[in-house]
Amino acid sequence: MSDREQRDGGRSAENNNDRKGRNNGRRNDRRNHQDNERDKYIERVVTINRVAKTVKGGRNMSFTALVVVGDGQGMVGVGYGKAKEVPAAIQKGAEEARKNFFRVPMIAGTITHPVEGRDAAGIVMMKPAAPGTGVIAGGAARPVLECAGVQDILSKSLGSDNALNVVRATVDGLKQLVRPEEVAARRGKSLEEVAPAQMLRKRAGQEA
């Protein structure tokens, strides 16, 4: 025990231990909070690629990960991570995806109207579908729709098969979706004049 600790009866050591305990407790709380936040979301890794950068001393190898994250209830985001290890690249992609969250308008588990998304050479067509149809989508478009919580949809990729282009085209299409109330307000009409009767019945059944 140091002279200072002897003079104050060992209180300094006790205070230090208490301080360390509080700091460890805060770190554990933050870690648990992050784990809980992660558990709330659906996470899908679309692609992982290895890339090489040629430098003076040779080649620097790294990995890229295209990640989709959503809550399954209308929120979804896409992120692109790059790191020297695969887990780190996936983590960076997931963090970026959470920053890019946006809401997808849906009625009874399907999108509100037909839409076509484009990005570079990627073209994705999406149409509403009847209950029980399921997610009719292939390739990189399916993870985006599933993470968003879309249950019934008809979609088709009409352009490039590149995963990044397809994902971005799907996101572009979903961002074009508008709620019937917005269309009615824009046109100065009632909801019944704008939205099909079948859609209104679906919404009434969903809210009941």
Swiss-Prot record:
GO cellular component: small ribosomal subunit
Keywords: Ribonucleoprotein, Ribosomal protein, RNA-binding, rRNA-binding
Region of interest called Disordered, as start-end residue ranges on this chain: 1-38
Domain of life: Bacteria
Gene3D superfamilies per UniProt: 3.30.160.20, 3.30.230.10
UniProt domain S5 DRBM: residue ranges: 41-104
PROSITE patterns reported for this sequence: RIBOSOMAL_S5 (PS00585), S5_DSRBD (PS50881)
Recorded GO MF terms: rRNA binding; structural constituent of ribosome
Stretches with biased composition (Basic and acidic residues): 1-21
Single biological process term from Gene Ontology: translation
Similarity remark: Belongs to the universal ribosomal protein uS5 family.
Subunit note: Part of the 30S ribosomal subunit. Contacts proteins S4 and S8.
Function: With S4 and S12 plays an important role in translational accuracy.
Domain notes: The N-terminal domain interacts with the head of the 30S subunit; the C-terminal domain interacts with the body and contacts protein S4. The interaction surface between S4 and S5 is involved in control of translational fidelity.
Protein name as it appears in the record: Small ribosomal subunit protein uS5
